[in-house]
């Protein structure tokens, strides 16, 4: 039996990964992390979506220690979430939570070991992203190797969106006939606003720009998507 664990926040990317995983695996387990994030309403959104989409199980794990250690505008109300800046100098944004994906993928692997899943699926990508070092393909592969050595079992880290831009991620949701669900019922906004979000933060900017690009050129974007990932 094919089983997978999806690292699930209830945002656009992880929900798209969940939708795809449900087509590819016999059992799909979701794991969501409560680290005291500013936009913690995402946890309720994740619960609703996991139930609505039919995940096999959904575990919400308290990892509050990350909030104590990682200083970020997503973990401290005293640090404002920055608006999108097209002229940013390339420095890490204040929304970066150091160690987040290291911790999440490690714990997801332990959960995968428990439920005998062969894969951990995460929605990180290197194309349209905010410059976070723990979203890079190089990092994911290195951590995957280390965890396999540490637990003595091969658990594949799957990154379906790694080389997709945001327009192609929207196209993937549309391919599975879930574009409206992704648009209106997921929470990607750093300020915790569901759907189209605040429209000001970097996450909302990337999401809106990708949607506009997809809607303006659907046929070409879908063709690009199919060529990249081998969809029929």
UniProtKB/Swiss-Prot annotation:
It holds the Pfam family QueC. One of its GO terms (molecular function) is zinc ion binding. Its EC number is 6.3.4.20. It is an enzyme of class 6 (ligase). Transmembrane segments: none annotated. Coiled coil: none annotated. Pathway: Purine metabolism; 7-cyano-7-deazaguanine biosynthesis. It catalyses: 7-carboxy-7-deazaguanine + NH4(+) + ATP = 7-cyano-7-deazaguanine + ADP + phosphate + H2O + H(+). Keywords: ATP-binding, Ligase, Metal-binding, Nucleotide-binding, Queuosine biosynthesis, Zinc. GO terms for biological process: queuosine biosynthetic process. ATP binds at residues 8-18. Binds 1 zinc ion per subunit. It comes from the Bacteria. Its cofactor is Zn(2+). Zn(2+) binds at residues 189, 198, 201, 204. Catalyzes the ATP-dependent conversion of 7-carboxy-7-deazaguanine (CDG) to 7-cyano-7-deazaguanine (preQ(0)). PANTHER family: 7-CYANO-7-DEAZAGUANINE SYNTHASE. Belongs to the QueC family. This is 7-cyano-7-deazaguanine synthase. It comes from Yersinia pestis. The lineage of its organism: Bacteria, Pseudomonadati, Pseudomonadota, Gammaproteobacteria, Enterobacterales. The gene is queC.
